[in-house]
């Protein structure tokens, strides 16, 4: 039986990071650079991909479902 590999440390860190709150978008982007050592654009690309990954849903269901709802609401606004 082929088991899906688990999320790597960076993917888990992105999900954990997204559970935090920030005072402004600038503060969040600065924290992404400093704490995760990645560009904010890359962070959001990875986060968006994780929202469609069943492994991410299993690892952080509350966070993933909340972000899916936010993403869907933004899509419907367009």
Which functions belong to the PLM regions below?
Residues 12-67, 71:
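Amphipathic, hydrophobic secondary-structure cores in small proteins
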């Amino acid at each position: 039986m082929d088991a899906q590999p688990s999320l790597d440390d960076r993917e888990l860190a992105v999900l954990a990071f997204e559970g935090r709150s920030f005072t402004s978008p600038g503060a969040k982007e600065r924290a992404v650079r400093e704490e995760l050592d990645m560009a904010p654009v890359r962070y959001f690309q990875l986060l968006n991909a994780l929202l469609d990954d069943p492994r991410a849903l299993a690892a952080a269901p509350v966070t993933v479902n909340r972000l899916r709802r936010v993403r869907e609401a933004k899509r419907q606004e367009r």
